[in-house]
Amino acid sequence: MKKFIIIQLGLALLFFAACKTEPDANAVKKEVLNIHDKLMMDGEKVVKNRIKLDSILKSGKIKSAVDSLKMSTLINQLNKADERMMDWMHFFKDDFKGKNEQENMAYYKSQMIKVRAIEDQYIQVTKVSDSVLRNYNIKSVETTEMKNHKH
């Protein structure tokens, strides 16, 4: 009976030791791709806001020279955010295969940091551009859903 209990405890210990509490590389990769999908929708808004701001700038409806400079700077920031996303997508390796799980995890964690920084930049520039558009009584664009996008 004593051997049976020891064997049962040993099996239970092995079972719990095999369970991971940290996400694996595939889970981190999936989260990176989910953020990418959200940023694709947000990127549409970045581009449309930039086009609207550019139209205001070219229309001559700018309230002052200071506003004109601020709007030009904001358009530049929107362009940079969009370019940063395009660069990240160009260099991102969806099918990355390292020598081991740790390399895979390190790669996808590094990509998570990069894509989160882009997300922060998108949030900042869309917030500011939405505010400027409201000042000119122009409705900002709502993001659309990517229902058919698959990885």
Map each language-model feature to its residues.
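Sec-dependent bacterial lipoprotein signal peptides
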Residues: 1-23
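Immediate post-signal-peptide N-terminus of mature secreted/exported proteins
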Residues: 19-66
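C-terminal amphipathic alpha-helix
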Residues: 39-43, 104-151
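Charged/polar positions within long, soluble alpha-helices
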Residues: 44-51, 55, 83-97, 120-134, ...
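Long, amphipathic, charge-rich alpha-helical segments that form helical bundles/coiled-coils
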Residues: 71-119
